[in-house]
């Protein structure tokens, strides 16, 4: 079940454990925000480009299309996984 009543809702993480849901009509502004956020990622390469780490750890929630950047040897990554 999605985190909101709407199956069209997409989760947008703000921090490691906090986020909000948005309807797809607002996704272009959210995509821009995620591009600008230093720790949100879709790939390891994106983390390296942002300088936020070298590993993109995906959220375990299928409704979140992004991950969080970590250094591959960081203690925070071990806690996230």
From Swiss-Prot:
Keyword Disulfide bond: yes
Xref: InterPro entries: Albumin_I, Albumin_I_a
Propeptide: 27-34
Pfam families attached to this UniProt entry: Albumin_I, Albumin_I_a
One function term, GO molecular function aspect: nutrient reservoir activity
Protein modification: Three disulfide bonds are probably present.
Record keywords, A-Z: Disulfide bond, Knottin, Seed storage protein, Storage protein, Toxin
Highest taxon listed in the record's lineage: Eukaryota
Described function: A1b binds to basic 7S globulin (BG) and stimulates its phosphorylation activity.
Domain remark from Swiss-Prot or TrEMBL: The presence of a 'disulfide through disulfide knot' structurally defines this protein as a knottin.
The protein, known as: Albumin-1
Organism listed in the record: Lupinus angustifolius
Gene: LEG1
